[in-house]
């Protein structure tokens, strides 16, 4: 299957952001995107920017389904396995290490994951 991949990602230089921590975020987010991307023109988009001490990452993917949030602000997984469904929790854990958090939105047949961290 062909998936368009768009990137405007810039790693913030001279900050306290650990490359391993960023890899946890990117690996989990991209795995989620690859598992769930759908639509007639499937795409994954990654962008980032830094403003003062704040580093923002936005990851979008086309998605024609419906997320089920249940009692949480994170969607419930429908897949089985002890480790399945831990990706967003791992992303949130890392963001909170940097006094940040994540948000997840769905609309216009896409899912948008936003990650905010303080990197100074």
Tell where the protein language model's regions lie, with residue ranges.
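Conserved polar catalytic motif of the HATPase_c/GHKL fold
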Residues: 24-32
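Glycine-rich/acidic phosphate-handling loop/turn and adjacent ATP-lid/helix
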Residues: 55-85
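Glycine-rich ATP-binding loops of the HATPase_c
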Residues: 99-109
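Glycine-rich nucleotide-binding loop
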Residues: 54, 65, 107-114
């Amino acid at each position: 299957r062909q998936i368009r991949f768009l990137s405007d990602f810039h790693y913030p230089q001279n900050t306290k952001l650990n490359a391993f921590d960023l890899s946890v975020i990117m690996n989990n987010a991209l795995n989620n995107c690859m598992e769930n991307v759908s639509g007639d023109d499937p795409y994954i988009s990654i962008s980032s920017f830094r403003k003062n001490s704040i580093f923002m990452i936005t990851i979008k993917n086309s998605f024609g389904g419906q997320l089920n949030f249940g009692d949480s602000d994170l969607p419930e997984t429908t897949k089985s396995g002890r480790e399945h469904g831990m990706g967003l929790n791992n992303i949130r854990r890392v963001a909170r290490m940097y006094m940040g958090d994540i948000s997840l939105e769905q609309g216009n047949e896409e899912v948008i994951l936003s990650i905010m961290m303080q990197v100074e």
